[in-house]
Amino acid sequence: MSRKLCTLNFTLSGKQGSLVIRDIQLWSNRPTASKSTSELRGQFIQYVDLAKLPLWVRSTNMNTYRCYSTSATAQAYFKSKLRNANRGIVIELFDKVDQRSQEPAYLIIFRENTELNCFQVDLTMKHEFDGQVTKLKQEIGKTRASVSKEGSIDIIIQQSQQRKIGTKTKVYRNVHINDKRLQFNETLSKLILGGLRLRGISNSITDYQKLYKITFDAAEFTHRDELKRISMGSGEEVSFESLQETVETLLKLFTKS
């Protein structure tokens, strides 16, 4: 029998402010010792391709939780962001830490068929790998004096560091691109929700989510060239004024009686 474990609220942060995705209920089919439900808070980190995640992220015996929400904003957000079956949303939890490392705990929310699910990232195997790497470095340090070619290990370490720098540069570039796209999505979502409120359109109306989605998709299509340049790392952010004008034009068109 399923039971509700907790409720998750997480923040989408951007330069124009923060949008909170609320009331994501996590349910489990497995029995738990605690009978009380708690509230988790977190923040959006990034989107990931589930097919490219390391094997240690998800163990075979870990729990997968079913996610539900009565929030129209949350439903619209997940519907828009999880259209790709392999896409996941990484959330860093504020109130929960990994028991072994005392590092922040992470959830990955994803869609499986028509159901919304999530799981906590398993860091156990990562810590084992880190331990093996530390042990290997210690062994290399002990045998360094007996290496016949002086400086050979230094060269290897230097090359490794250069590779890491190159990887970090690529990661920073991707993060910068993701930040620009996330900022576009956050600003667009706020403008649409604000425009609907100004027109007296309540989220209790049957076609509210449909109107939100077609406006969102149409705005993305309108600015497709700018978004393409952003994805290639050569474009600037779409200005607030330009996006506001687009949303106003679309809402006038879609809500015209």
From Swiss-Prot:
Keywords: Cell cycle, Cytoplasm, Cytoskeleton, DNA replication, Nucleus. GO terms for biological process: DNA replication; regulation of DNA-templated DNA replication initiation. Pfam families: Sld7_C, Sld7_N. The keyword Cell cycle applies. GO terms for cellular component: cytoplasm; nucleus; spindle pole. Its main location: nucleus. It is found in: Nucleus; Cytoplasm, Cytoskeleton, Spindle pole. Coiled coil: none annotated. InterPro entries: Sld7, Sld7_C, Sld7_N. The keyword Lipoprotein does not apply. Required for the proper function of SLD3 at the initiation of DNA replication. Binds to SLD3 and reduces its affinity for CDC45, a component of the replication fork. Required for mitochondrial morphology. Interacts with SLD3. Belongs to the SLD7 family. This is Mitochondrial morphogenesis protein SLD7. It comes from Saccharomyces cerevisiae (strain JAY291) (Baker's yeast).
